[in-house]
């Protein structure tokens, strides 16, 4: 089954509402919580979310600067991993992609038993990580980007689980939601990342139900 990740903003007015949104997303069945690129410190935000959730995975962004200070990064990862009871996933940004940064992130992550996903990774060596994020702007482009990585993993006999995440806009309705999930899953995606939206909770809970159009029937007599 396709996993669903929800991308939360990194800015908010009321911390109580923000944490309540995170709990609601977990209750609705989402696999993971992701964060926008700009705003408050992501590690502090995820630490707060970790204390009020119990199942959902917490995706922490890792930058080139983070990898340049491995001791500090290790301390942050150890803290968040302990608070979340092992629910942390690391994403390495596009600017940090490359053999050395990826190897450093993987070594650090293995010590804390967490996965590493590469963002916007087009290099087949991305197959050495645990997954990739943000490939392509359509199911067709997604498939074209994933296939070389899949062939690399097959050639290198890398048989472990590998996650392929696509980022989409908030669907307009349930029919679009069903169609996008089907198309991306057929293209090789294992997960979709969707921006937080009040309508998303209903899609997560009832996305496979037919929309009630009885009001149209009544209006038409």
Regions found by a protein language model. Name each.
Residues 1-221:
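Active-site-adjacent structural elements that line small-molecule/cofactor binding pockets in enzymes
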């Amino acid at each position: 089954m396709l996993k669903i990740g929800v991308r939360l903003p990194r800015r908010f007015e009321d911390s109580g509402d923000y944490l309540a949104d995170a709990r609601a997303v977990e209750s609705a069945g989402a696999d993971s919580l992701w964060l926008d690129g700009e705003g408050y410190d992501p590690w502090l935000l995820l630490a707060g979310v970790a204390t009020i959730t119990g199942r959902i995975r917490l995706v922490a962004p890792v930058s080139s600067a983070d990898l340049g200070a491995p001791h500090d990064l290790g301390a942050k990862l150890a803290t968040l991993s302990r608070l979340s009871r092992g629910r942390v996933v690391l994403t390495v940004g596009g600017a940090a992609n490359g053999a050395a940064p990826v190897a450093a992130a993987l070594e650090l992550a293995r010590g804390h038993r967490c996965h590493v996903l590469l963002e916007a990774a087009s290099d087949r060596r991305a197959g050495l990580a645990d997954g990739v994020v943000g490939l392509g702007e359509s199911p067709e482009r997604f498939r074209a980007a994933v296939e070389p990585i899949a062939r690399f993993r097959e050639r290198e006999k890398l048989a472990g689980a590998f996650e392929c995440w696509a980022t989409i806009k908030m669907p307009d309705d349930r029919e679009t939601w069903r169609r996008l999930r089907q198309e991306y899953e057929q293209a090789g995606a294992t997960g979709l990342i969707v921006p937080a939206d009040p309508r998303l909770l209903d899609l997560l809970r009832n996305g496979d139900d037919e929309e009630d159009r009885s009001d149209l029937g009544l209006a038409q007599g």
